[in-house]
Amino acid sequence: MKSYFKFLGRHRLFTIINIVGLCLSMAFLLLLGDLIYRQTSVENFQSRGERIFALGNEEFTMSHFRVGQKLQDRFPEIEAWCSVSGYNAMFDIRGMEVQTEILVVAPNFFEFFDYQLLTGDKHKVLEAPNQMVVSKKFAKRYWPDGDAVGKEVVLGDKNDPDGHVTYTISGIMDDFDRSVIPSSHECVVNLESHKHFNYSAYTEEMNNAGSSVLFLMQREGADLRSKTDAMREYMKTFFWLYRMDAVKQVTLTPLSTLYYDAKECSFQSGDLNHGNRDMAHLYVVIALLVLVFAIFNYVNLSVSLTTERSKEMATRRLLGLSRLQVFLKLIGESIFFTAIAFGVAYLVALALQDKAVEMAACPMDLLKDTGIVTIIGFVLIIAVVGALAGFVPASILSGYQPIDIVRGTFRRRVRQRWSHVLMVIQAVFAIVMLTVTLLLSGNIREKMQQPLGYDYENILETWGINNLSLTQRQTYRQKLLQMPEVDGVGYGYGTPLDFLENNTTQADDGTVVSMRYLMGDSCFFNILNIHPEKTYSDTGVGVNHQLLRQFGKSDDAKEIVTNSGNINFHIAALYPDIIYQTVMNEEKHPTPILIDKVDEYRDDSTSFVQRMYGSPRMAIVKYHGNREKVEGKMKVLFQEFTGHEAPEAHSLEQKHQEWYEDYERFLSVLTVFTFVALLIAILGLMAMNSYFVGQRRREIAVRRVFGAELSSITLRLLRTVVVQSLVAAVIAIPLAYWLAPTAGSISGLHVEMQFMPLLLSLIIVLVVNVLTAAIQSWRAATENPVNSIKNE
């Protein structure tokens, strides 16, 4: 090893470039490996996980909790059922207002699943409606002395005898980890609590057909999936969702694959933990390509420097070492070098872990997940990568006879091999990665900047307004309008950037229509700048073009009446189509919207909206100038009226950006990979050009002696690099045309190939190639030819 260390010391550029390349690529592989391990091991601790299925349909993996008991009574293949729902909640704990997320579950939750219960009897902790189980993290936060069991938690106004519910903590569970249930859910209560959070999720009519994730446990030896057709027919007799053919299939998704395979599976408090299997595979492929890229660099540079160690290897052969012994020595050195790079990569991965968690929005813990089996895997990876990286240079050095090295024929043969092909491959990879990144980045930015059909800039929204009386709402608006920064205050039930109330029905031709209700007062619609294209009367509802299209009506229709009698309303106004939530969703599934607009919400028992949904739930405030001042005033007024801490105010612009977070994360990861790939490519090209020019120093010196111009020598050297770049471009263009739409479809984007990103990528890679070669060539051309000839 002593001679190897001397070699690394003499060639510091070689050492640095290979350490950087292997280190960064393996660090990414470590992080991605931990990410995928955690994703693929979600819920794998469930002892009956293979027998537990989530009930759903072709549209979403959700149902109503009352369906569970009906199916169990009908189908003996079902051993048990358990429903899970999630809500945002605000509690009073010893006078402190606490915001958290809560699960409303069937009483058998801790018997059905293997989530660890640290304190309490799993058969009894949720048998009463007022019992609550809290997470270890939640208990430690509010009862650090460890005496949480038996304490009371109050939902609602504790000073109002009819307006609050008191829960008693009956047990403590471990925090949710490697589960489809987000760890932000810290409290668990009996399903009777649906009445306090979402009454439509409790009613026997099962109006809220997707209020719960319903799990069915199959009896051992049974085949529950063979009963899906029978389940569908049975549910047509009692479940309106199937009776009116709003959905046509029954799906059973195993708990073990729910993380990847669930469709539209969420709680009211947010989505369940989920992943995209194709995207995970794409990340791994890219990371492996970056590693291959780094190995190419190692091979390329090692081959270029084989002549530097040729005399050493010739001497070893002459001293009695066999060809195999020389080969194994070189492979051992490569594995040792890879092991050093891997050690550094592990430390780099630990340093980048928090940033990776933020970008991937998925928990990782590399240190915690490193066990004996993992370490054995690491050793195998080091051995394989080291052997692959060292195979080619070891084969070359051990394959020639010592006499070839003494004569100098070895040097002449090696100079012409490997480097050209590997440099072309590097350039191809760089062009394709850069093209895909630029194209997807431009596509996402374009969609984010696309007009939505309404205003969202300089608008704040806040919820909980349903806690205010009519007089308080009027005073709230009046006092805010007294501020010079406030331009308007409107009340409603949600903006197009929120989850709007919906009603699923059926048109006469059998088309299932899932309408969204956009409801607000006149100020609400003025602030959003949503106005009708046509107004027919003062009574009735507004509709957009998409709603008319789905019911098979023309744009001048004045009413919609279905033969079944489910729908019968008068059209007062026609509104333009608007984007509901994201452009991507709207492109796939245009949203029919029913608009209910009133001058002002009063306590009107005859109002359909207020009878169904209660008082207005939220306010939007149009402002200019100092946002913090307006936000502060909103909080002060809410607390003054209710005595409770005000919910956070959010800007609609921020909510608009949040809808694109998944796409932004994907783009961020892809950008990082591209940057690393380009960095490795640039370093490799710099080194290769340096060694390539270095090997031709004698030729350059001889040409200088015979009077060649510096420019002609430089251009002659650059010709090879330009040809390599052109060959790379020819290969990269069809690859980019194929890969960009594929990567886009995996991330949920419809991407069409554009010329400019491809052209820009070609120019960037060509400039980097030519510039690095030009600098090295110019330095070689301007060097004193005497030194080059003397050294040869």
Residue ranges of predicted features:
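Mid-to-C-terminal secondary-structure elements
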Residues: 106-119, 132-275, 475-478, 482-658
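Alpha-helical transmembrane segments of integral membrane proteins
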Residues: 1-19, 269-272, 302-332, 339, ...
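Hydrophobic alpha-helical transmembrane segments of multi-pass inner-membrane transport and secretion
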Residues: 10-39, 274-311, 339, 343, ...
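Membrane-helix entry/capping segments
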Residues: 6, 10-12, 46, 235-287, ...
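C-terminal transmembrane helical bundles of large multi-pass transporters
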Residues: 644-729, 742-745
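Transmembrane alpha-helical interface segments in multi-pass membrane proteins
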Residues: 16, 21, 312-354, 677, ...
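Membrane-proximal extracellular/periplasmic loop immediately following the first transmembrane helix
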Residues: 32-90, 94-96, 202-203, 208-215, ...
